[in-house]
């Protein structure tokens, strides 16, 4: 048995050497983390005692003051079937913003995702599909470059420029006020990052829940300190907004390519590139909470301001293998690729944070090995405590005073780490999750350890960290209630309802009336009636339809909707039902516009389809900036003069109304303005006193020649009341008298 004792003694002394080595490394790393803790708490206390005593905290209402600038959301999508629709639906119904477009990058060899995106684009005019040039999966950066190229093409065709470019994944749940925050800052800041707070699962889902622990501390303390000391903010890859200046600089720097296609963490890479160019970066923790409710708590010890932070929510991987894959990709990108791409700088402060980024390659191994050593030491301690005559193996540690001091210091630093983790997890998720984060420490260390091994293995296999391919991990998406179907073509609905034949549809498609969409064109050609068109449009959009008399709408109800809003969305308020405003429209209203309408009128809005021309004539009567002859008044006066019977006047009105068309419809149908971009221009037009046509010419969107041509087509398409009266048998003198009487009213 002597040999066994020798082996045990050798193991014991080897354990001591390993423990000493680990203790020294952990002490250095612990001091590093403790320094960040001290800076954070000193800065927080100082700001609370000085800044916030002199100045009130900024209210979220300030975010509403700037005009909505156009923002582009970039979403790379590889094998994201069934996710994009939910994201667009949730964004449309929850975002307190209207002037945004979503560009989804897909791949030619991913038809299922493309099909999903096509269906979403049919319902949401602000969602656009981008097909990458190369088959997937390429890198996320390559996909984003394709998306950015498509955005620049869209800007040229729509004749306007986006002010900000936002990174998101398809699984992200975007905070309702996120775009307003970006809109408020994007003119002054070049990189804006908001926190990421993962969704909770059941407490037994340890893998997924380790993400809430790490992000709570990272985005609650570490990144704010980094920004304060170094002025540099690493992008999280989601919830990041780049200014136009930043994107232009990146494109110029990369000769037309903004994102490094060989990088697995292009977001991390860009933060340094922009910093090198002297651009300003900011990490924003901005709560949306009423001052009166600031002290309210949803969970025990949960902070009201922290838990109402504008942030990105998403589910993170819930299985051990997917978490290891994802984190190994992060390690390759930040540690190995980052070390090769971003050399040490002349700034000691920035170098310090580069060191903190890269020490993970060591600390992840050290933390796990330290756990294993601690388990062995605890077993030895249990042995000595349970057996009175046990050998005192731990005496080899107690004999070194400096080692015991080092171990006690490390113990104190470890307790501090646990306390810090509990504090920051509790702030957002409540005390229960804060305490459970202690139990998840070992599991998180195991995941990080295995991710380190996998990252190291991949780098060694490829020989160059920049050759490792994008290993996309899948995420869950929160369930979204509501109908996410795509829109059926209008022609198909008319065929199914046996309103027209296939031959008539083919003829209508070949001989479409210039300036009109298919429905209006078939109405002009006499193939369908206004009622049949309204019924088909209502079926297409899943709403009801009805016929209205705009002149019978109470003026008190008209006052519910500002003229700029009614003209922008081409709607009329019809009635109130249980505090819900019912509005009429001649066409389907997309979910983004419907949500914007709800915000602008201050009450829930529902819409119905009405007969062709009834909204146009109603808008001209109630809201038009420059009123011409009132056609309804001319008919009324003709009846009063007994030049027409009431029956004749009614028939003339039924001929007149369906042949009235909006200028914007003709303009977009002719292709002079992208239909998905018209909303951006209409938002800007809300603040102008000019007619829409003159406004577009003044803004350089269209030429005067184009305006004249569109107005000419509008006049040719529309039927004038004067011509109908002459056709009904009135002479020119009678029509002139009616015009004169109309002007005098």
UniProtKB/Swiss-Prot annotation:
Keyword set includes Nucleotide-binding: no
Keywords: Cell inner membrane, Cell membrane, Membrane, Transmembrane, Transmembrane helix
Organism: Escherichia coli (strain K12)
Transmembrane segments annotated in the record for this chain: 8-28, 362-382, 393-413
Function: Required for bacteriophage N4 adsorption. May be a component of the phage receptor.
Any one biological process term the GO annotation gives: protein secretion by the type II secretion system
UniProt gene name: nfrB
Subcellular localization: Cell inner membrane
Pfam families on file: Glyco_trans_2_3, MshEN
Name of the protein in its database record: Bacteriophage adsorption protein B
InterPro entries, per the entry: Glyco_trans_2-like, Nucleotide-diphossugar_trans, T2SS_E_N_sf, T2SS_GspE_N
Gene Ontology MF terms: ATP hydrolysis activity; cyclic-di-GMP binding; glycosyltransferase activity
Matches recorded under SUPFAM superfamilies: EspE N-terminal domain-like, Nucleotide-diphospho-sugar transferases
Keyword flag Acyltransferase: no
A cellular-component GO term for this protein: type II protein secretion system complex
Highest taxon in the source lineage: Bacteria
Membrane topology of the entry: Multi-pass membrane protein
């Amino acid at each position: 048995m002597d040999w066994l004792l020798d082996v045990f003694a050798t193991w014991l002394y080897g354990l001591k050497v390993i423990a000493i080595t680990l203790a020294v490394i952990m002490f250095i790393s612990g001091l590093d983390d403790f320094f960040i803790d001290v800076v954070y708490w000193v800065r927080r206390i100082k700001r609370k005692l000085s800044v916030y005593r002199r100045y009130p905290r900024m209210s979220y209402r300030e975010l509403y003051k700037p005009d909505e600038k156009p923002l582009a959301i970039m979403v790379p999508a590889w094998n994201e079937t069934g996710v994009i629709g939910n994201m667009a639906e949730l964004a449309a119904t929850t975002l307190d913003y209207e002037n945004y477009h979503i560009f989804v990058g897909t791949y030619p060899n991913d038809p299922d995702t493309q099909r999903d995106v096509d269906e979403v684009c049919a319902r949401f005019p602000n969602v656009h599909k981008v097909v990458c040039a190369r088959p997937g999966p390429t890198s996320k950066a390559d996909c984003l470059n394709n998306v950015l190229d498509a955005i620049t093409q869209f800007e040229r065709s729509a004749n306007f420029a986006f002010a900000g470019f936002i990174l998101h994944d398809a699984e992200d749940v975007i905070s309702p006020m996120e775009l307003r925050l970006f809109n408020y800052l994007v003119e002054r800041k070049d990189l804006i990052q908001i926190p990421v707070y993962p969704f909770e699962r059941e407490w037994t889902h340890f893998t997924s829940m380790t993400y809430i622990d790490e992000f709570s501390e990272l985005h609650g303390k570490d990144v704010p300190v980094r920004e304060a000391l170094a002025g540099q903010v690493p992008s999280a890859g989601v919830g990041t907004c780049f200014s136009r200046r930043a994107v232009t600089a990146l494109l110029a720097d990369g000769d037309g390519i903004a994102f490094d296609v060989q990088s697995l963490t292009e977001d991390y890479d860009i933060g340094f590139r922009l910093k090198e160019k002297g651009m300003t970066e900011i990490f924003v923790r901005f709560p949306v909470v009423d001052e009166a409710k600031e002290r309210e708590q949803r969970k025990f010890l949960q902070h009201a301001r922290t838990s109402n932070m504008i942030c990105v929510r998403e589910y993170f991987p819930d299985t051990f293998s997917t978490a290891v894959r994802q984190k190994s990709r992060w390690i390759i990108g930040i540690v190995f690729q980052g070390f090769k791409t971003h050399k040490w700088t002349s700034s000691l402060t920035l170098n310090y944070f580069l060191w903190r980024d890269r020490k993970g390659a060591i600390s992840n191994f050290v933390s796990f090995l330290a756990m294993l050593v601690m388990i062995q030491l605890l077993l030895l301690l249990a042995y000595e405590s349970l057996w009175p005559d046990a050998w005192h193996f731990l005496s080899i540690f107690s004999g070194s005073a400096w080692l015991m001091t080092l171990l006690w210091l490390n113990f104190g630093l470890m307790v501090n780490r646990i306390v810090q983790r509990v504090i920051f997890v509790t702030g957002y998720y409540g005390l229960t999750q804060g305490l459970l984060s202690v139990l998840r420490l070992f599991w998180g260390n195991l995941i990080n350890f295995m991710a380190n091994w996998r990252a190291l293995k991949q780098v060694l296999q490829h020989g160059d960290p920049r050759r490792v391919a994008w290993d996309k991990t899948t995420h869950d998406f929160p369930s979204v209630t509501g109908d996410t179907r795509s829109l059926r073509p209008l022609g198909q609905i008319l065929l199914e309802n046996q309103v027209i034949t296939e031959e008539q549809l083919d003829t209508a498609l070949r001989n479409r009336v210039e300036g009109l969409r298919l429905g209006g064109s078939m109405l002009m050609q006499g193939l369908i009636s206004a009622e049949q068109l309204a019924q088909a449009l209502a079926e297409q959009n899943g709403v009801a339809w009805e016929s209205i008399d705009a002149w019978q709408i109470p003026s008190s109800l008209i006052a519910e909707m500002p003229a700029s809003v009614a003209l922008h969305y081409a709607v009329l308020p019809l009635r109130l039902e249980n505090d819900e405003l019912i509005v009429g429209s001649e066409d389907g209203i997309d979910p983004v516009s419907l949500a914007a309408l709800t915000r602008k009128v201050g009450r829930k809005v529902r819409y119905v389809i009405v007969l062709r021309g009834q909204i146009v004539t109603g808008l001209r009567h109630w809201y038009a900036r420059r009123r011409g002859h009132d056609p309804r008044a001319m008919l009324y006066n003709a009846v009063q003069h007994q030049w027409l019977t009431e029956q004749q006047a009614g028939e003339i009105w039924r001929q007149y109304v369906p042949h009235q068309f909006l200028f914007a419809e003709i303009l977009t149908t002719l292709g002079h303005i992208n239909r998905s971009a018209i909303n951006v221009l209409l938002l800007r037009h809300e603040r102008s006193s000019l007619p829409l046509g003159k406004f577009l010419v003044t803004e350089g969107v269209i030429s005067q020649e184009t305006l004249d041509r569109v107005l000419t087509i509008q006049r040719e398409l529309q039927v004038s009341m004067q011509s109908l009266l002459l056709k009904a048998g009135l002479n020119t003198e009678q029509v002139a008298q009616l015009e004169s009487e109309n002007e005098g009213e």
